[in-house]
Amino acid sequence: MRGGGNMQQMMKQMQKMQKKMAQEQEKLKEERIVGTAGGGMVAVTVTGHKEVVDVEIKEEAVDPDDIEMLQDLVLAATNEAMNKADELTQERLGKHTQGLNIPGM
């Protein structure tokens, strides 16, 4: 069979890439990414898997007469942390798929 060796080599490369990507996913699980808003008045920490693990709100951010502002700060900090987590994931996993012409990756 012609080309069989190439297919085997490609399968080995794919298995190796899958293993490396699984290892990176585990590392991302342990990463902590912080998003802030309001000049640091609100900080949200997420994992590389985008699980919120901590929310810090400084006392000066709490105004009982303006709860909406605090909500906006929490949302902004959360979105920043999630975006940073996406960027980190893309950076870490993207290096393993560079050069491959696989649809959807």
Curated annotation (Swiss-Prot):
Q: Name one GO cellular component term.
A: bacterial nucleoid
| InterPro entries documented for this protein | YbaB-like_sf, YbaB/EbfC
Q: Does the keyword Cytoplasm apply?
A: yes
Molecular functions (GO terms): DNA binding
Q: Does the keyword rRNA-binding apply?
A: no
What segments bear the compositional bias annotation Low complexity? 7-16
Its main subcellular localisation, reduced to a broad class, is cytoplasm
Q: Name one Pfam family in it.
A: YbaB_DNA_bd
Q: Where in the cell is it found?
A: Cytoplasm, Nucleoid
Q: Where is the composition biased (Basic and acidic residues)?
A: 21-33
Q: Which keywords describe this protein according to UniProt?
A: Cytoplasm, DNA-binding
Kindly state the subunit structure of this protein.
Homodimer.
To which protein family does this belong? Belongs to the YbaB/EbfC family.
Q: Identify the HAMAP family for this entry.
A: DNA_YbaB_EbfC
What function is annotated for this protein? Binds to DNA and alters its conformation. May be involved in regulation of gene expression, nucleoid organization and DNA protection.
Q: Specify the protein name.
A: Nucleoid-associated protein SAOUHSC_00444
Q: Which organism is it from?
A: Staphylococcus aureus (strain NCTC 8325 / PS 47)
User: Which taxonomic lineage is given here?
Assistant: Bacteria, Bacillati, Bacillota, Bacilli, Bacillales
